[in-house]
Amino acid sequence: VIDTHLLALQLMAAQGALGAFDTLYHHEGTEALPRRGTAGRELAIHATRSSIYCALFIGLSSWAWHGAWAWVLLVVFGVEIVLTLWDFVVEDGSRLLPPTERVTHTVLAINAGAFIALLAMSATGWAAQPTAMVWQPQGWLGAFLALCGVGVGLSGLRDAFAARALFRRSAQEHVRAVEAPVRFGSRPQRVLVTGGTGFIGQLLVRHLVADGHAVTVWTRDARSAAWGFGGVVRCVQSLDRIPAADDVDVVVNLAGARILGMRWSERRRAQLLQSREGLTQQLVAWIAARPRKPWLLLSGSAIGYYGVQPQGDASELAEDAPPQAVFMSQLCQRWEQAARSAVAHGVHVACMRFGFVLGHQGSLPQLLLPISLGMGGRLGSGRQWLSWVHVHDLIRAMAHVWTETEKAASPAAAQAFNFTAPGALRQEDFTRIAASVLHRPCWMPTPAAPVRLLLGEQADLLLEGQRVVPARLLQSGFRFMFPDARSALTDLCRPR
């Protein structure tokens, strides 16, 4: 005779293990839901479901729910079924699930249906008993279920806080868009964006659409990108999908593989070059073949163009500062040179040398994590310069360069602009300010040696720096909303 109650608990244990995989691999890993701007409602549902599963795992691990408690259990099952169906609807409305996540969710739903049906059979018998939570230990199985309950409860808290942060961020961005809208040029244009699904690209596309521009995004996964943008932009996997009859007025080139990560082996260097120089060359070749050329190319670059500035050197680096013979500088030089070749086709080119971009996504959350845990401190000597920019100022600066170039009506030319705030500071000062904004201590330094051992030459991005100034932006009349690190971090870190 099969013990249906024991079988139900075993299926619950499988649910806990598979749910942990789904949370860690998909929600926190590949999909990064806590950092996805459109995932607030999904995370709120996850938080509610996690609290239900926490109660079920712990409550059924060692107790039988007799009498009125059996009816409570049946009601909880009903609520969970409704929330599961709602979760499916919200997920499909906000993002394109990868195949592995969709399969995992299907298996979880089938398994949940099985153990809920089996436990409902037990509950009908429990309902006839006097009302009580009856101790009924299940040995190691019960201990595992209780552990699953603790884990899913913590996951629910994580999702609840993340959902709250996303809702607040959305409200803040809405208020900012209403009170200080970003204007790109004097009239609606047709814009092609590469790298439009990245941290900066997503924000740029939203601002372009809000300003009335028709946006096309060139991306590797057009279907997923179109889903993520809610169908308001055209997404293509190949430039050949843009008909010759469809004019493009402005191109914004932000594409490029992530710099920080694996060591810079020869293979990795080739990937970084191909994703920047190679892609930009493809873009310029496409421009050359167009019957009507775009009039402006805004192309990404980085302050790594200037190489490494000795820590004892406090001189400011403007756009005319020379590059160096190190890989990061050479990468930026080749990237910019590929973009500048568009001038030969009558296109204005602006190379945007980005500093460390501060935003709710990107590298800042990882940088702030040890500080928020009370374990922040200087990195290496802490004397290296950190040139940064708030992401909202970066978007505004793009709009400014666009507008000023449109006004100039001069022959096609190429210029470089430093996209950094005027308030560059040393890394230890930045960390101290971040700890102050987060109300945390700043006491635990990270020595340079293990960082260099782990990353090799790439460690220069963290342990060395440049004191870069936005000379051309300031000379052309641009004004930063967040000129100093404290105002930028306060805007990004404090709840609204």
Predicted features along the sequence, with ranges:
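Mid/C-terminal beta-alpha module of Rossmann-like enzyme folds, strongest
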Residues: 181-190, 404-457, 490, 496
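N-terminal Rossmann NAD(P)H-binding glycine-rich loop of SDR-like oxidoreductase domains
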Residues: 189-211
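Glycine-rich "substrate-gating" loop/helix at the edge of Rossmann-like oxidoreductase active sites
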Residues: 323-328, 353-361, 381-391
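Alpha-helical substrate-binding/gating segment
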Residues: 340, 368-376, 384-425
